[in-house]
């Protein structure tokens, strides 16, 4: 059975990779589908994210990387996938993902959403958090694949960190 794991992956984290690896054990094939959303200001281009995810998942023979525009459920239908794979960290993730699952089901009754809870060590992790840490020069090597850590370091050593006002 084919599953689609959609997201922006800006950047991919070890939490994402954990879900991908576990999904790859459950499904015959997993498509990591990188959403192109022109409304969001991404740190990395879609092309960079494709390369990052491909490098991070190269050890998984039943995982492929693709991009899409538009509705996730329509992308899944175009790929003949009947399962959306989603990761859950906290209760608020579940509330949002449940709403999205019902919405997707209303758009295409054949689609199912499979939720995997994140492993404990990644329950706090998000791409936004990683970018914030990297932006201020913090170490992110334990949060993202090695290739992504290098990309983040290169990105933020070229971009000056805004100065903060001294504490009074």
From Swiss-Prot:
Pathway terms, separated by semicolons: Cofactor biosynthesis; coenzyme A biosynthesis; CoA from (R)-pantothenate: step 4/5
Class of the enzyme per the UniProt entry, highest EC level: transferase
Annotated localization: Cytoplasm
EC number: 2.7.7.3
GO molecular function: ATP binding; pantetheine-phosphate adenylyltransferase activity
CDD domains in the cross-refs: PPAT
Subunit structure: Homohexamer.
PANTHER family for the chain: PHOSPHOPANTETHEINE ADENYLYLTRANSFERASE (PTHR21342:SF1)
Protein name: Phosphopantetheine adenylyltransferase
Organism annotation: Thermosynechococcus vestitus (strain NIES-2133 / IAM M-273 / BP-1)
Gene, per the UniProt record: coaD
């Amino acid at each position: 059975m084919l599953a689609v794991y959609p997201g922006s992956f800006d950047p991919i984290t070890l939490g994402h990779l954990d879900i991908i690896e576990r999904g790859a054990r459950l499904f015959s094939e997993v498509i990591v589908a990188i959403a192109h959303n022109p409304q969001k200001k991404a740190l990395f281009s879609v092309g960079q994210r494709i390369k990052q995810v491909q490098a991070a998942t190269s050890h998984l023979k039943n995982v492929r990387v693709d991009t899409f525009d538009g509705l996730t459920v329509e992308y899944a239908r175009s790929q003949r996938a009947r399962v959306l794979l989603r990761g859950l960290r906290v209760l608020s993730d579940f509330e949002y993902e449940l709403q999205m699952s019902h919405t997707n089901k209303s758009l295409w009754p054949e689609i199912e959403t499979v939720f995997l809870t994140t492993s404990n060590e990644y329950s706090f992790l998000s791409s936004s958090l990683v970018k914030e840490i990297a932006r201020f020069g913090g170490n992110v090597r334990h949060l993202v694949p090695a290739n992504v850590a290098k990309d983040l370091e290169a990105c933020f050593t070229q971009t000056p960190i805004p100065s903060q006002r001294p504490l009074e």
